[in-house]
């Protein structure tokens, strides 16, 4: 992944990586840290191999499975609280139709999911993480970024097709459930 460090632009506003390529995730998170920009990890199981990247990420957004893999706890809120004990970044767990939980000053804060008719969940997590990264890059605070990302994922789930169902920024901003 050494080549990735050289290939990273210097004018980034955020980085997003997942745990499937631990070396690449580490480079992306170190770049974010060095540039003082958000570094978001899509923490999907198995997460152990990406532990160094998780330690320096500014935002660790676990799936339920990723949070359970990291902590051994199946309850998203308890897993988030436990993960926050060993990670310095903002800990978030996406929990599908139940919403998203994040840890703020040691307390679990839930963001409710939109009530929609689900058509297809393929790529919903990827849409959520990408929208979250875009929102942080745009300067939104974590709460608003989570809401923006959750809206994007809800729109995607209400449509068929994986990435073809991903909404535009305008669709997310104009959405009302």
Where is each model-derived feature located?
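Ribokinase/PfkB-type carbohydrate-kinase core domain
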Residues: 1-108
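Conserved phosphate-binding/catalytic region of the ribokinase-like
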Residues: 48, 75-177
